[in-house]
Amino acid sequence: MPNTPSPLALTQGLIRCPSVTPAEGGALSLLADLLGAAGFSVERPVFSEPGTPDVENLYARIGTAGPCLLLAGHTDVVPPGDLAAWRHDPFGGVVEEGEVHGRGAVDMKGGIACLAAAILAFLAERGPDFGGSIAFLITGDEEGPAVNGTVKLLAWARQKGERFDHCILAEPTNPDRLGDMIKIGRRGSLTAALTVHGVQGHVAYPHRAENPIPGLIRLAGALLAAPLDAGTAHFDASNLEFTTVDVGNPASNVIPAEARAVFNIRFNDLWTPATLEAELRRRLDAAAGNAVRYTLAVQPTNAVAFLTQPDPFVDLVTAAIEAETGRRPALSTTGGTSDARFIKDACPVIEFGLVGQTMHQIDERAALADLDRLTAIFRRVLDAYFPGDAALQKRA
């Protein structure tokens, strides 16, 4: 079998590309060269949106037959922050004490490197006629606004007639150890601003003013008085958290004209953004009556709750993880949002990658042993998926 690059070498190569969102930084070029040499057709569409930076993306595919396994991720990273606080250059890919250091080592250049290493080894052994197709969908706009990335790349692929049967998104899903957790869904996210309107005045003459602060407290209490729900089989209860409260008033002898609070709700699959907003307004109207004047501004959101039902594909990935780590992963929907919220409209999607303890932190790093094990897990998935269990092939 020809030599194929190691997951460490690929991780280091990607880390050394300074792809702070939305910069491409050479990361997509590295992958394009690698995949092109392995026989993939590679395209690099650039998407635009007024008020946001143009973003370059990558789509690569090998094979035309079904089933098609989609492998997804992002090469953009968050800024490194204070460079002096890092033990090593955040774009150096330095190895120390069994770990590779650098921005994106965990989130998620290491995961992409493991996918690529597994696929290259798979193709080197099996050749291009492996009984299906493999597609790579990589964006440079996940850590940023996420408007010129995966969502548009999927629409672009759909217009080209591309179809996918299942997807693995290599996000760092494991809390503590490799093999802890597969994400089979994500909670939705809704942010809103609640403003209570009053009348500004002197504190010594409250009868000439209308203090909005008691009204804000009253309405906030109404939102928090009862749980939104009790959770579902695969989701925790929906949760509302106030994140800012402000009256815009530096003077201690002035009653403010308005009081404003912002809150975020992470919600489960019992709700949609529309039904959740309706429930919020019902509670607020009941509490406000004719005594409190308020406005509620809900931010548009594309982060809806979704669930990939456990099925033979989830079982296949679970078995591969258990075979390599000895751990049976939990099937979870916890955590924040990811690009899986877009992919779920194209095909069933699960997320599995490295241990996420240091993602977005100073001295972000990944264990070399985990890179090897994750690559072995992905290789097991490929071997089982092609030709795969007959139950999986029904969608092809």
Curated annotation (Swiss-Prot):
GO terms for molecular function: acetylornithine deacetylase activity; cobalt ion binding; succinyl-diaminopimelate desuccinylase activity; zinc ion binding. It holds the Pfam family Peptidase_M20. InterPro entries: ArgE/DapE_CS (IPR001261), Bact_exopeptidase_dim_dom (IPR036264), DapE_proteobac (IPR005941), Peptidase_M20 (IPR002933), Peptidase_M20_dimer (IPR011650), Peptidase_M20A (IPR050072). The keyword Metal-binding applies. The active site is at residues 76, 142. SUPFAM superfamilies: Bacterial exopeptidase dimerisation domain, Zn-dependent exopeptidases. One of its GO terms (biological process) is diaminopimelate biosynthetic process. Gene3D superfamilies: Zn peptidases (3.40.630.10). Binds 2 Zn(2+) or Co(2+) ions per subunit. Pathway: Amino-acid biosynthesis; L-lysine biosynthesis via DAP pathway; LL-2,6-diaminopimelate from (S)-tetrahydrodipicolinate (succinylase route): step 3/3. It catalyses: N-succinyl-(2S,6S)-2,6-diaminopimelate + H2O = (2S,6S)-2,6-diaminopimelate + succinate. Its EC number is 3.5.1.18. Zn(2+) 2 binds at residues 107, 143, 360. Homodimer. NCBIfam families: dapE_proteo, PRK13009.1. Catalyzes the hydrolysis of N-succinyl-L,L-diaminopimelic acid (SDAP), forming succinate and LL-2,6-diaminopimelate (DAP), an intermediate involved in the bacterial biosynthesis of lysine and meso-diaminopimelic acid, an essential component of bacterial cell walls. Belongs to the peptidase M20A family. DapE subfamily. This is Succinyl-diaminopimelate desuccinylase.
